[in-house]
Swiss-Prot record:
PANTHER family: POLYRIBONUCLEOTIDE NUCLEOTIDYLTRANSFERASE, POLYRIBONUCLEOTIDE NUCLEOTIDYLTRANSFERASE 1, MITOCHONDRIAL. It catalyses: RNA(n+1) + phosphate = RNA(n) + a ribonucleoside 5'-diphosphate. Belongs to the polyribonucleotide nucleotidyltransferase family. Its EC number is 2.7.7.8. Its cofactor is Mg(2+). This is Polyribonucleotide nucleotidyltransferase. It is found in: Cytoplasm.
Length: 805
């Protein structure tokens, strides 16, 4: 029933298997590729285009279902929705790799679907998907003259060692994350993120990928020969030379004048007018009257003419469309801090390309939770690229971000990511939004420059400035020209889009797309060196505006501070059922994250709220010490004194003799429940705390100088009172026996008795004696804290199951 063709080879340290003839037999081409534990079903179907077009209507879709990793989708519907960004990026990798290899003039609709069947989280699915797509095309009968293969490349700088298809563990140690694709003779596509690698190291990675793909290309050829195509699609390119000659003789002057205009807007208007009249004339002559050509061939002839005109001008006159030299950068204008309430902003303008980049900082609770087939993770750096239609002067409805926006945003993300501080050094969640307000080529690289400037304006401590530049190529036979900072027309009519971003010390991102069937290593090497010169020039311009990140963040940025407490005190801070931490959050308006290692992260919109929350937490975790002053609340009144709740629920007794420096007839005459007081710890007997009010200024909390505590001075002015004395707990807590009986117990029972009103302190803060004599309460604005209490730490929250409140 099944006519199965199967070929395999040992590639790297894993077995690569290509098989067809069993699954999806009605597709023009269908293969299952297994590599290690990763398996992808790739299918190809084609049909004639419904409308005349001058491009290849190719659609590539990579799909990753959760069953590939043995999971059921989350959410209510338990079914996959729209493609994730990761799926979109892999789809683009496959598309950009195979598109240049189709013959010129072939405009049939082609749909390629790569379905991830199994994923071992070791073998990269993008590698398997591209090999599957190439193998499916090879047996489909669709004109695809040469096979292509791809591989993921890593690099360990310390060992000077490149890695073929690294695992996730190896990739975490690698300074390079590159995807390479190419044929036997040339490089077709490169996408990479690097930790400031040199041009030589990047070129070495491309060479390594090219060499290691050779055996896969041999395998695809062997497989295609064994399987054979089902039905060959006949494609014989129609000679459109006659139409091109007609255009050259009658319309060459109009196009030459249009392409001589250095202003993009007027140049576009002239070109549109020339094309409109030309298309109608050619269709009437060559389609309607003679019937010799189709509308699609007329469109292709116009594009061929324009392409040859511009390319000849560049190679013959050594001048580009806008009059620049090959290595000349457009005029650059830079401005930072231009959006008032943003956390940081920059406007980067290069010629007619402009990016308005704005940043926003958030707490770790704002991190994006990514639930993908690579595993769940939290992303703290977000970069979003938006390209509205007005950027190119078009009237079109705004739509959600498409593949292009996602791809350009990811490229800029890769360029900036290697220079960001660690979470321990800068725990904020960072979002960068690039609004492309004008575009004439290289908008993704303008985003890189603008993002670097905006982050420095925000106060994010970047390692270095990052700049990006897009390189182009015009190649005719053995003649070629590498162009720096290409504009839109040079991208449209050229042969290469080669984008390089990095710092003064090295490359952080590289992307190469070809429109011809690949290039040699000599052109890549020249492009890298010319891109380096341009990158350093742009960084010099950027450094004149802002060279280093600003000190600190703006006042309206969410405040974030950390403190470390004893792990045994975590339950005290949380409280029964979260009572204490909820009370802190509700009172101060902060958010609190507590990790199992004792790290407490506090997030708020203002510094005052953070300080108040810190003081409340310190009150809970601090231990009372003799000689320290605390704020507290009267929780219970007794005949012999008053019980005070302080330090988040600790109870102590202020004996009647320690309330005032004068005779008191009754405690209730001067104190009442819920009164806020300042108390000095004068004695601790196990869990029983003896307090004094009379030795402390009740307004400021300062210790009265003539009443500095001394163990020898244990009697107050009421020395004649039978219950006086300050040295022992029993003297303060016990009182006369008849008073103990009225209190419902003996032996200090009143101190142990709980009161419903003793759950919290009226105000936070503590004072050291004698170092802090005259020091105001931290709650009232002073940030000086010494002595006992939790140590403070700066940096990120703990990584052991944090709890959020």
């Amino acid at each position: 029933m099944f006519d199965i063709t199967r070929k395999c080879v040992e590639w790297g340290d894993r077995l690569l298997v290509i098989e067809s003839g069993k699954i999806a037999r009605q597709a023009d081409g269908a293969v299952v590729v297994d590599y290690g534990g990763t398996s992808v079903l790739s299918t190809v179907v084609s049909q004639k285009s419904k409308e005349p077009v001058d491009f290849l209507p190719l659609t590539v879709q990579f799909l990753a279902k959760s069953y590939a990793i043995g999971r059921i989708p989350g959410g209510f519907f338990k079914r996959e929705g729209k493609p994730s960004d990761r799926e979109t990026l892999i789809s683009r990798l496959v598309d950009r790799s195979i598109r240049p290899l189709f013959p010129t003039g072939f405009c049939d609709e082609i749909v390629i679907v790569c379905n991830l069947l199994s994923y071992d989280q070791v073998s990269p699915p993008e590698t398997v998907a591209l090999i599957g797509a190439a193998a499916a095309l090879a047996i489909s009968g669709i004109p695809f003259p040469t096979p292509i293969a791809g591989a993921k490349i890593g690099y360990i700088r310390e060992e000077e060692r490149y890695i073929l298809n690294p695992s996730a563990e190896e990739l975490a140690r690698s300074e390079l994350d590159m995807f390479y694709s190419g044929t036997k003779s040339s490089v077709v596509m490169v996408e990479s993120e690097a930790s400031e690698l040199s041009e030589e190291e990047m070129l070495g990675a491309v060479t390594f990928g090219h060499e290691n793909c050779a055996q896969v290309l041999d395998l695809i050829e062997e497989f295609a020969e064994a399987a054979g195509p089902k039905d060959v699609v006949e494609f014989v390119p129609h000679d459109i030379g006659k139409v091109v000659s007609d255009i050259s003789s009658g319309y060459s002057e109009k196009f030459s004048v249009a392409y001589s205009d250095h202003n993009k807007k007027t140049r576009v208007l002239q070109l549109d007018a020339a094309r409109e009249g030309l298309y109608s004339d050619l269709c009437r002559k060559h389609v309607e009257e003679s019937g010799e050509y189709t509308e699609q061939e007329v469109l292709l002839a116009i594009k061929t003419f324009e392409r040859s005109l511009v390319r000849a001008r560049v190679l013959d006159t050594l001048k580009r469309v806008d009059g620049r030299g090959f290595d000349q950068i457009r005029n650059i204008e830079i401005e930072v801090d231009l959006i008032p309430r943003s956390h940081g902003s920059a406007l980067f303008t290069r010629g007619d390309t402009q990016a308005l980049v704005i940043t926003a900082l958030g707490t770790p609770q704002d991190e994006q939770v990514v639930d993908g087939f690579d595993g769940d993770r939290r992303e703290r750096f977000l970069l979003h690229y938006n390209f509205p239609s007005y950027a190119v002067g078009e009237a079109a409805a705004l739509r959600p971000p498409g593949r292009r926006e996602i791809g350009h945003g990811k490229l800029a993300w890769r360029a900036i990511h290697p220079v960001l501080p660690t979470k321990a050094d800068f725990p904020y969640t960072i979002r960068v939004v690039s609004e492309i307000t004008e575009s004439d080529g290289s908008s993704s690289m303008a985003t890189v420059c603008g993002a670097s400037l905006a982050l420095m304006d925000t106060g994010v401590p970047l390692k270095s400035s990052v700049a990006g530049i897009a390189m182009g190529l015009i190649k005719e036979g053995d003649r070629y020209a590498v162009l720096s900072d290409i504009i839109g027309d040079e991208d449209y009519l050229g042969d290469m889009d080669f984008k390089v971003a990095g710092t003064k010390d090295g490359i952080t991102a590289l992307q190469m797309d070809m429109k011809i069937r690949g290039i040699g290593f000599d052109i890549i090497e020249k492009s890298l060196q010319q891109a380096k010169d341009g990158r350093l020039f742009i960084i010099g311009k950027m450094d004149k505006v802002i060279k280093e990140s600003r000190e600190g963040v703006r006042d309206h940025v969410p405040r974030m501070e950390s403190m470390i407490i004893d792990k045994n005190k975590i339950k005290n801070v949380i409280g029964t059922g979260g009572k204490n931490v909820r009370e802190i959050c509700e009172k101060t308006g902060v958010k609190i994250e507590i990790s199992q290692d004792g790290t407490v992260m506090i997030y708020a919109v203002s510094r005052d709220a953070v300080e108040e929350a810190k003081n409340m937490i310190m009150c809970i975790v601090s231990e009372p010490e003799v000689g320290k002053v605390f704020s507290g609340v009267i929780s219970e009144i007794a005949k012999y004194g008053a019980f005070v709740s302080f330090l988040g629920g600790r109870r102590g007794l202020v004996h009647i003799s320690e309330i005032k420096n004068e005779h008191i007839g009754s405690v209730s005459d001067v104190l009442a429940v819920d009164d806020k007081v300042k108390v000095l710890v004068i004695g601790i007997d196990k869990d029983h705390v003896q307090l004094s009010m009379r030795r402390v200024d009740q307004d400021s909390g300062d210790l009265l100088e003539h009443e500095s505590y001394s163990s020898s001075k244990k009697n107050g002015p009421q020395s004649g009172d039978a219950s006086g004395g300050a040295s022992g707990f029993r003297d303060y807590a016990s009182g006369p026996a008849r008073e103990r009986r009225r209190s419902g117990g003996s032996g200090g029972r009143p101190v142990r008795r709980r009161s419903a009103g003793s759950s919290g302190s009226g105000s936070g803060g503590y004072y050291s004696v004698p170092q802090h004599v005259g020091t105001p309460d931290p709650v009232n604005g002073n940030d000086r804290r010494r002595g006992s209490g939790p140590q403070h730490a700066s940096g990120g929250g703990g990584n052991k199951k944090p709890r959020f409140f």
